[in-house]
Amino acid sequence: WDQHGKTMESWNQGGLTYYRIAGPLVPTLFVNQFAYLEAAGAAPLYAKVTESTGKTAVLRTLKEYTHAKNSVWGVTARNREQNFALNLLLDPECDFVTLTGTAATGKTLMTLAAALSQVMDDRRYTEIIVTRVTVPVGEDIGYLPGNEEEKMNPWMGALDDNLEVLSRSDGGAGEWGRAATNDLVRSKIKIKSMAFMRGRTFLNKFLIIDEAQ
């Protein structure tokens, strides 16, 4: 702030605070990049770059998904990076998000929670399409019977595991309520094979590519 706050402008919009800053780091900032300041004795600042002209940049504070009141389908961010990820996944102006990290860091869980929130609650998209490359870890199990979705099931264990976590997050729904919710959720999720995607056009869909590497 000592270097970038001298000519700073700030304003509030939609419950979030915006800062227009100028300084030596501004030329290195790009849109949708996150900036944070964690100083001893002061409240931390977490923000996303929404505009960058080279001389000035606009930062917007984030919605804090680390708080239970802002949980997404029962999922709360456990750390700074997960909070950044949820802010991107739930931003309707951000069309393409890639998440990278070690195993068991919540990438698929957060993405699925964000997708369900925007399909079931906000009605922003009509359904969720999930796909991944069908590369076996060990020996190939050969030809699989069934339709496209049934053939994909052996590779969708992580999806099923995360759906189970999300359906159990509604503790007050009871067993019948959770079963009904689970059936409704699954009706909004379509599993597609990448082998048959060439030439397809998906309109108003939330597309998840798991294990994209």
Feature annotation, model-predicted:
Residues 1-66:
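Interdomain "pre-motor" coupling segment immediately N-terminal to P-loop NTPase/helicase cores
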Residues 74-93:
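N-terminal pre-P-loop "Q-motif" helix
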Residues 91, 120-123, 198-201:
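Conserved catalytic network of the ASCE P-loop NTPase/AAA+ motor domain
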Residues 93-98, 204:
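Pre-Walker A (Motif I) flank of P-loop NTPase domains
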Residues 99-101, 111:
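Hydrophobic anchor at the beta1->P-loop junction of P-loop NTPases
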Residues 102-103, 133:
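P-loop (Walker A) phosphate-binding loop of NTP-binding proteins
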Residues 109-183:
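Conserved P-loop
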Residues 185-213:
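Conserved RecA-like ASCE ATPase "motif II neighborhood" in helicase/translocase motors
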